[in-house]
C-alpha cells in the first residue's frame, strides 16, 4: 500500500533536487525520495546495530600503487581480516593509480572497523565504506 504525503522545500532546494533526479534518470520525485529514505534506513541499521548481526558492505579505495608501503599496509589489513573479505577487485586506473573494490561480510562492528581502517590508511586518495542490505525491512 502506498501513502501520499506532502513536503515543503525552498525553491532553490527543489530546483537542485529536480535537476539531480533528472540527471539520475528518475521518472518522478517519489522514486527519488523513496531511494533517499531507503539509503538513510540502511545507514541507520548499520550504525545502530548491536554489532552482532551479519552485515555486508562495499569498500572503494583509490591509491597510488607506487607507494609500496601503502599497498603493503592495505594488503596487511585485508589479510588480518581475510574471513571478512568475500571478494576483491583490483583495477589499474592509469600508470600510477589503482582502484580497489572489496566486498566485506561479517559482524557489523567488524565490517565497519575494517572498512574504516582501510579508508583511513594514510595515502588513500579516495575511500568510501558503503553498507549494503537485502532490503527485507525497507518495504
Curated annotation (Swiss-Prot):
GO terms for biological process: response to nickel cation. One of its GO terms (molecular function) is DNA binding. Keywords: DNA-binding, Metal-binding, Nickel, Transcription, Transcription regulation. Coiled coil: none annotated. The keyword Transcription applies. InterPro entries: Acetolactate_synth/TF_NikR_C, ACT-like_dom_sf, Arc_rbn_hlx_hlx, CopG, CopG/NikR_regulator, Ni_resp_reg_NikR, Ribbon_hlx_hlx, TF_NikR_Ni-bd_C. Belongs to the transcriptional regulatory CopG/NikR family. Transcriptional regulator. This is Putative nickel-responsive regulator. It comes from Anaeromyxobacter sp. (strain K).
Amino acid at each position: 500500500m502506498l501513502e501520499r504525503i506532502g513536503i515543503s522545500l525552498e525553491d532553490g532546494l527543489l530546483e537542485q533536487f529536480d535537476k539531480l533526479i533528472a540527471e539520475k534518470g528518475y521518472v518522478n520525485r517519489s522514486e527519488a525520495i523513496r531511494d533517499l529514505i531507503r539509503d538513510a534506513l540502511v545507514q541507520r541499521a548499520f550504525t545502530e546495530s548491536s554489532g552482532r548481526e551479519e552485515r555486508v558492505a562495499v569498500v572503494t579505495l583509490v591509491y597510488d600503487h607506487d607507494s609500496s608501503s601503502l599497498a603493503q599496509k592495505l594488503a596487511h589489513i585485508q589479510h588480518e581480516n581475510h574471513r571478512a573479505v568475500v571478494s576483491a577487485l583490483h583495477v589499474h586506473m592509469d600508470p600510477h593509480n589503482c582502484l580497489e573494490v572489496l566486498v566485506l561480510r561479517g559482524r557489523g562492528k567488524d565490517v565497519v572497523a575494517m572498512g574504516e581502517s582501510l579508508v583511513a590508511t594514510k595515502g588513500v586518495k579516495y575511500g568510501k565504506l558503503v553498507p549494503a542490505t537485502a532490503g527485507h525491512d525497507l518495504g
